[in-house]
Amino acid sequence: MEKNMGKIFYLMGKSASGKDTLYRRLMEELPLRTIVPYTTRPLREGEENGREYHFVGEAGLARLRAQGRIIECRTYQTVHGPWSYFTVDDGQVNLAQASYLVIGTLESYIKMQQYYGSEALVPIYIYVEDGERLQRALNRERLQSVPRYAELCRRFLADEEDFSGEKLRNAGITRSYSNQDAECCLKNIKETMKIECEV
């Protein structure tokens, strides 16, 4: 019997919906690999280069683009200037050997689906009630040595458009996972993963 191909489980949702916490728990509890994305934004406190992101400057992005290795790239005009987030074909993915867990945006999910094929990607859309999400974002930003409240507000408003119901439907995302209760959300995600492949 032929071995099942791996999947790319694509975790996405609005900012402060709990994606990072769910991601860490899933990585600890399941034999999944990750695809570390790239960004031109500065490191946040507690982040490490090569763990959450590969932090490269604009010159690094230009070099990878010239080499034709960019799978998808999004650039946001922040109050601190343009910040790009992107995925690179750098040899991290081998679906014949493993399944992967990735955090990304709806836009990046669509581009990854076009690159790897729809059968390889499984969307996991996380949501939290907006008031709770805003409070979580504010609490997290207060912990930064230099809080960026204007950027927090920009992200919150941009998420409303980026993850609209219409855009989710157009991307073929029909299931969502409430993260009001992290344990329940984690259980539901694991059930989906088990159905999709043996992880």
At which residue positions do the language-model features occur?
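Conserved phosphate-donor/acceptor-positioning beta-strand/loop module used by diverse small-molecule
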Residues: Y100-T105, Y116-R140
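The feature captures the helix immediately C-terminal to the Walker
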Residues: Y23-R24
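Small-molecule kinase domains that catalyze NTP-dependent phosphoryl transfer to phosphate-bearing small molecules
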Residues: R142-E196
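P-loop (Walker A) phosphate-binding loop of NTP-binding proteins
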Residues: K14
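Hydrophobic anchor at the beta1->P-loop junction of P-loop NTPases
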Residues: L11
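Short beta-strand-centered segment that lines the nucleotide-binding/catalytic pocket of NTP-utilizing
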Residues: L32-R44
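ATP-dependent small-molecule kinase phosphotransfer cores
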Residues: R41-Y100, G104-L106
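Walker A/P-loop
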Residues: K19-D20
